[in-house]
């Protein structure tokens, strides 16, 4: 078994000998097929919450002159807590706007740093047109983060075709 053979016998050598270091990429390639991403573009790790935090922190670094983050008030609560907490800890003047889902598009403009949305609403099943919304945000110069927790494997997703950022 993995525990007795790899962990018990190899100990720390397992990171190289059993290729543990490659696991995030190997599993990422399997998940990539579910979300329409190209091989080598998805890496698994930690938890979704940590990955949302890392993606948002990176996206804000990529747009240092923009201060607006838009989500929607139907987003998964943890995503909103993460965004709010990160914005407070950065203390760089960012603001999180959470309109009703039908009003999100009206906030996509040249002030937008990051658009952070959940593809499928976990309560209602409402689904954003990922390709159209991503294009709108990119045309405005913004970065887009999609939470696919309720989409992957349930509905067709084409991250590569949408040119999604995160």
Placement of each model-derived feature along the sequence:
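Pyridoxal 5′-phosphate
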Residues: 1-166
């Amino acid at each position: 078994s993995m525990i007795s053979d790899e962990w018990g016998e190899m100990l720390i050598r397992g990171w190289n000998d059993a290729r543990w270091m490659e696991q995030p990429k190997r599993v990422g390639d399997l998940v990539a097929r579910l979300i329409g991403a190209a091989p080598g573009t998805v890496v698994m790790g930690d938890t979704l919450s940590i990955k949302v935090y890392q993606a948002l922190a990176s996206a804000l670094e990529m747009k240092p002159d923009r201060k607006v983050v838009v989500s929607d008030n139907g987003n998964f609560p943890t995503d909103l807590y993460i965004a709010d907490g990160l914005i407070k800890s950065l203390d760089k003047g960012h603001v999180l706007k959470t309109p009703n889902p039908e009003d999100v598009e009206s906030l996509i403009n040249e002030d937008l740093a990051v658009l952070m949305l959940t593809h499928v609403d976990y309560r209602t099943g409402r689904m954003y047109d990922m390709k159209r919304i991503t294009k709108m945000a990119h045309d405005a110069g913004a970065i887009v983060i999609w939470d696919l927790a309720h989409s992957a494997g349930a509905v067709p997703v084409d991250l590569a075709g949408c040119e999604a950022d995160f």
